[in-house]
């Protein structure tokens, strides 16, 4: 899955680099995690990880604290996580994750963006068997032996581990480790990562394609334009694809 990671990293950073809505989206992730598991990060692994992800993107502490406080408000009570299935041009598959207080508005916006971008809105559940729901963590590259890390984390629910190497925004070569586990293992895997002293750069539950597809550069450009428009929508939290 190395190339898939490189695509995800490059495309995400390109979009986030010019996306003024980054902090609100990170804040909404924090609010939803606090709403689900409580406002105490020590007792809520999803919240701890959402905070770590926000900090890695330099989100100010005041914004993080405000996002946690919003979890107890009426607005947060109305927000629901919704997933929509779709196709991008050239057959790329999309699962679009939204956090919305008005599903009627959200589905109308998603359909409009897909139609204008030569995509297709699919019935809910169409892609269920083409993606797997997984716990996914990206951590700083460990100093200790990777085999030892892998063996230790297997006891906490690790199913796969992936080394990544890429050029960061400073032009330096950076290495990270992506750690995968089953959907149900998020809390225990998070605990294992913390016990090993690994620094979490990001972590959440994701839809990971069972099979990735490689697209030509000219096709990828059109697909990327559609994904960018989807991610610019206020209600969209993430777009998962089968792009290799």
Curated annotation (Swiss-Prot):
SUPFAM superfamilies assigned: YebC-like (SSF75625)
Subcellular compartments: Cytoplasm
Stretches that traverse the bilayer: none
GO cellular component: cytosol
Gene Ontology biological process terms in this record: regulation of DNA-templated transcription
Gene Ontology molecular function terms on file: DNA binding
Main localization (coarse): cytoplasm
Pfam family, one: Transcrip_reg
Record's keyword terms, sorted: Cytoplasm, DNA-binding, Transcription, Transcription regulation
HAMAP family recorded: Transcrip_reg_TACO1
Membership in a protein family: Belongs to the TACO1 family.
Name the UniProt record assigns to this protein: Probable transcriptional regulatory protein CHAB381_1426
């Amino acid at each position: 899955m190395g190339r898939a990671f490189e695509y995800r990293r490059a495309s995400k950073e390109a979009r986030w680099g010019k996306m003024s809505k980054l902090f609100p989206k990170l804040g909404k992730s924090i609010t939803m995690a606090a709403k689900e598991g409580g406002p105490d990060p020590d007792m809520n692994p999803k919240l701890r990880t959402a905070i770590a992800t926000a900090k890695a993107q330099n989100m100010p502490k005041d914004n993080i604290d405000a996002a946690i406080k919003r979890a107890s408000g009426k607005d947060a009570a109305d927000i629901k996580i919704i997933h929509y299935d779709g196709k991008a041009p050239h057959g790329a598959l999309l699962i679009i994750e939204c956090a919305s207080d008005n599903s009627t508005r959200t589905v109308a916006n998603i359909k409009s963006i897909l139609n204008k971008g030569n995509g297709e809105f699919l019935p809910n559940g169409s892609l269920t068997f083409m993606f797997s729901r997984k716990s996914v963590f990206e951590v700083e590259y460990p100093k200790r032996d990777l085999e030892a890390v892998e063996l230790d984390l297997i006891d906490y629910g690790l199913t796969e581990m992936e080394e990544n190497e890429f050029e960061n925004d400073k032009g330096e070569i950076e290495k990270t480790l992506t750690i995968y586990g089953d959907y149900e293992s998020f809390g225990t895997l998070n605990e294992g990562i913390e016990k090993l002293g690994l620094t979490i750069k990001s972590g959440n539950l994701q839809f990971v394609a069972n099979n990735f597809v490689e697209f030509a550069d000219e096709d990828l450009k059109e697909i990327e334009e559609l994904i960018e428009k989807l991610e610019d929508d206020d209600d969209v939290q993430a777009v998962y694809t089968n792009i290799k």
